Swiss-Prot record:
GO cellular component: cytoplasm; myosin complex
Keywords: Calcium, Metal-binding, Motor protein, Muscle protein, Myosin, Repeat
Listed name of the protein: Myosin regulatory light chain 2, skeletal muscle isoform B
Signal sequence annotation: none
BP GO terms, sorted: actin-myosin filament sliding; muscle tissue morphogenesis; skeletal muscle tissue development
GO molecular function, one term: calcium ion binding
Domain of life: Eukaryota
Length: 170
C-alpha cells in the first residue's frame, strides 16, 4: 500500500525529479510553506489568480494582467510544487546568500520598492514557518523600525542577516 501512495504522490507532484536533492529537507519544507501561501485556492497549482490574491493581501491591488502573465510564463507549464522548487533552484544556483534572501523578499515586493508592509511581514513571521514570538517581533521592530507609512526596508534586514551588522548609510 505504501508504494501506491508514494507513486500517487509522485504523480501529483509532477513526476520524480532530482530537484529535491538540491535542497536540504528543512529548505524544502520552507519552500512548501511559501508555495502553500501563494497557492491561495489550494489546488496545487500557482495561477495568475493565486498571484493576484496574494499580492492583494500585501496591498498590491493594481497589478497588471501582463505582469501576472509574465510571472506565470517563467515556468514552462503549470506551476506545481516541483516546478516551483525547480524555478527556485535555477535562480539560486551559485547565488550569494544575501541575494537569495533579497530575492525571497522581492517576491513579496512586485513594485520593487525595497520595502514590505510591516503588518504583512508580521503576519507572515507569526503565522508561517518558524513562527516568531511577540518578543521576537518587538526586537525586530526595535532593530528595523518601519517608516511613517508602515513600510520596512527588507534590504537592510537582509544585509544584517548575512553580514551581522547594519549597513552604513550611503
Amino acid at each position: 500500500m505504501a508504494p501506491k501512495k508514494a507513486k500517487k504522490r509522485q504523480q501529483a507532484e509532477g513526476g520524480s525529479s532530482n530537484v529535491f536533492s538540491m535542497f536540504e529537507q528543512s529548505q524544502i519544507q520552507e519552500y512548501k510553506e511559501a508555495f502553500t501561501i501563494i497557492d491561495q485556492n489550494r489546488d496545487g497549482i500557482i495561477s495568475k489568480d493565486d498571484l493576484r490574491d496574494v499580492l492583494a493581501t500585501m496591498g498590491q491591488l493594481n497589478v497588471k494582467n501582463e505582469e501576472l502573465e509574465a510571472m506565470v510564463k517563467e515556468a514552462s507549464g503549470p506551476i506545481n510544487f516541483t516546478v516551483f522548487l525547480t524555478m527556485f533552484g535555477e535562480k539560486l544556483k551559485g547565488a550569494d546568500p544575501e541575494d537569495v534572501i533579497v530575492s525571497a523578499f522581492k517576491v513579496l515586493d512586485p513594485e520593487a520598492t525595497g520595502t514590505i508592509k510591516k503588518e504583512f511581514l508580521e503576519e507572515l513571521l507569526t503565522t508561517q514557518c518558524d513562527r516568531f514570538t511577540a518578543e521576537e517581533m518587538k526586537n525586530l521592530w526595535a532593530a528595523f523600525p518601519p517608516d511613517v507609512a508602515g513600510n520596512v526596508d527588507y534590504k537592510n534586514i537582509c544585509y544584517v542577516i548575512t553580514h551581522g551588522e547594519e549597513k552604513e548609510e550611503e
